[in-house]
Amino acid sequence: MLFFSYFSFRDYYLTKLLLLILLCEMILPISAGLVFKEDFENIGELEDNWEIQGVNWKLSSKYNRSPNGYNSLRLAPTQLGVWQQMWQTVNYSKPFHLRIWFYERGWGNRVKVDQQYLFIGDNKTFDSSKKKCQIGQSGHKDYEGFYVIFDGLNARKSQSISDRERWVSFEFVIDDDGTAMIKIDDSVEITLVEKWETVGSIGLGVFGRKDRGGTTDAYWDHLEIFDTVGIPNLALERKNCLTTTWSKLRMN
């Protein structure tokens, strides 16, 4: 009886140790390379991280994309005909990978703004940046059913289509040699002409208009920044057993 109890006790703790090792093996690839995460769940953190410039914002429970999350960021203009935005001044070098999620409601419910965009610049402000890009949605008829990508001042229609309700990922990637690319829905849309060395500013902005149909607000969620080119997909699986650990991870 004592012999049996000894081995049962030993096997119990060996099993726990093996499970712990397996969990660590699974978690490390997820967290490796993550340097910033904004899941738009905490008002205090959001106000600390972002400079708000006139835009109407709130944390909304209408949609959510973050693991174990409840809210997303709702942005809307407070007046028409002016840019309103929220910004972060940052200092990241290549390699760099940013991913954020935009809630697509279909073209019939498109945003009623000239531009509702993610902005990225290589200097402390977007206006002072020599290299800049934008990814987002426009109510302009020329972009009906698609997204809009700006490489500097040059606009182009996306290959990805805005055809149905879903979360869409917008990504900006700089690889080890400075080659920069924009991805939508995990597909490369464009490789930028100029090489990028750094990212100095990121922002989300709106420009309201009254001459286009659609809705006035837009929803964003789960911004991640990595100092690696390749990033994990596992972190966004809501039902994964690791989401609790992932949702608590925050690195500045």
Task: Specify the residue positions occupied by each region the protein language model found.
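N-terminal secretory signal peptides that target proteins for export/translocation
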Residues: 1-15
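Extracellular carbohydrate-recognition regions
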Residues: 31-54, 238-247
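Extracellular glycan-recognition surfaces and repeat-rich motifs
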Residues: 44-75, 80, 127
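Short, aromatic/His-centered strand-loop micro-motif at the edge of beta-sheets
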Residues: 148-169
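Extracellular beta-strand elements of beta-rich domains used
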Residues: 40, 221-225
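Localized edge beta-strand/strand-to-loop motifs within extracellular or lumenal beta-rich domains
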Residues: 166-181
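Flexible glycan-contacting loops in extracellular carbohydrate-active proteins
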Residues: 192-221
